[in-house]
């Protein structure tokens, strides 16, 4: 038996991780790297998945999905954005909604949500910095 189930996703995998963490409360920690913004912050290559997003967004917003993915006892969601990513999901836009999602998560109950901006490179990948953060966070065993 596993103590926790954690999930890491990059790019479209981050989008998928956000959805799975929102609907499956067995996911303790979810790490989304360069793959999902609320629709109002997207630009260029950050296009939605037409059929899936249409169905999904008729029921909730991405901010709701982030709250659902981080809310609950022993649950945490961390979004990591590569500030200088040449592909997509760059900049510091995640910081614009971090406080609102974190506050809503705490208002409902336990859980945490945070955004990290990775300034160490300009590629669309999981950097050494992000990887070391994730491993350190998982090894904290604070649940």
Feature-to-residue mapping (PLM):
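Hydrophobic anchor at the start of a short beta-strand
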Residues: 5, 77, 112-113
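Gly/Ser-rich "nucleophile elbow"/oxyanion-hole loop immediately N-terminal to the catalytic nucleophile
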Residues: 1-11, 27
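Structural motif
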Residues: 10, 82-84, 119-120
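C-terminal catalytic histidine-bearing segment of alpha/beta-hydrolase fold enzymes
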Residues: 102-143
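Glycine-rich nucleophile elbow surrounding the catalytic serine of serine-hydrolase chemistry
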Residues: 9-21
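A short, hydrophobic beta-strand element of the alpha/beta-hydrolase
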Residues: 30-33
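The feature captures the conserved acid-bearing segment of alpha/beta-hydrolase catalytic domains
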Residues: 38-109
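Acidic-histidine catalytic/liganding microenvironments
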Residues: 24
């Amino acid at each position: 038996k596993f103590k926790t189930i954690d999930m890491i996703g990059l790019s479209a995998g981050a989008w998928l991780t956000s959805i799975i963490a929102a609907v499956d409360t067995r996911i303790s920690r979810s790490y989304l790297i360069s793959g999902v913004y609320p629709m109002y912050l997207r630009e260029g290559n950050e296009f939605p998945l037409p059929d899936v997003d249409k169905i999904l967004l008729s029921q909730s917003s991405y901010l709701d999905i982030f709250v659902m993915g981080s809310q609950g006892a022993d649950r945490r969601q961390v979004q990591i954005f590569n500030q200088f990513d040449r592909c997509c999901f760059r900049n510091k836009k995640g910081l614009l909604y971090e406080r609102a999602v974190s506050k809503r998560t705490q208002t409902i109950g336990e859980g945490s949500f945070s955004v990290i901006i990775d300034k160490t490179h300009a590629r669309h990948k999981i950097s050494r910095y992000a990887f070391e953060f994730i491993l350190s966070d998982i090894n904290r065993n604070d649940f």
